């Protein structure tokens, strides 16, 4: 078997699977470490040289269930409904 480009076509195994924390296909099976969020490390992987990547993951990109409620309450000056 040669060691160049032809041997690259022989690869069938999966190196990465879905990550529990970020949900991306970046969890390395052998190293047991996510390439995207560094799970299982407590602090998330985040570098300043990838500002675009940080913007993709930060607050406001998901469902924002609680933030929607807070914004509505701010607009109404935190008035409580009268029964």
From Swiss-Prot:
Keywords: Metal-binding, Ribonucleoprotein, Ribosomal protein, RNA-binding, rRNA-binding, Zinc, Zinc-finger. Pfam families: Ribosomal_L37e. PROSITE patterns: RIBOSOMAL_L37E. GO terms for biological process: translation. A zinc finger (C4-type) spans 19-37. GO terms for molecular function: rRNA binding; structural constituent of ribosome; zinc ion binding. Transmembrane segments: none annotated. The keyword 4Fe-4S does not apply. Zn(2+) binds at residues 19, 22, 34, 37. Binds to the 23S rRNA. Belongs to the eukaryotic ribosomal protein eL37 family. This is Large ribosomal subunit protein eL37. It comes from Leishmania infantum. The lineage of its organism: Eukaryota, Discoba, Euglenozoa, Kinetoplastea, Metakinetoplastina.
């Amino acid at each position: 078997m040669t060691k160049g480009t032809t041997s690259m076509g022989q690869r069938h195994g999966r190196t990465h699977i879905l990550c529990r924390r970020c949900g991306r296909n970046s969890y390395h099976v052998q190293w047991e470490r996510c390439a995207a969020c560094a799970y299982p490390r407590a602090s998330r992987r985040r570098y300043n040289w990838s500002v675009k990547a940080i913007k993709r993951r930060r607050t406001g990109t998901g469902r924002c269930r609680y933030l929607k409620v807070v914004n509505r309450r701010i607009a109404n000056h935190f008035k409580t409904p009268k029964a």
